[in-house]
């Protein structure tokens, strides 16, 4: 997945916003600019970016040792359940999109309930 493909996919999810920060990383949030981060891409010298996403406890345990995946630097070391795909051979782009969709859903659950209802995200549980 190229950076353009990553950005296009994240933009297709409901109520998302994009910012470039943290050393040129493409950061996607759900719930607007003050919302919750659900995906980060960048930090790679290769044409394919490293993609970091939030996941469930079961997915984290299942995937954290798979080739091409690792607990996300900084985030996972602080107890957060985030993984980073740093090699395209580890997970198909279709699977990555599924995990990005799930990350979006998980992040939306951390928005204030009133905002979830206002944005129509309360049905994502």
Would you name each region that the model predicts?
Residues 1-125:
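Charge-dense, helix-prone N-terminal extensions
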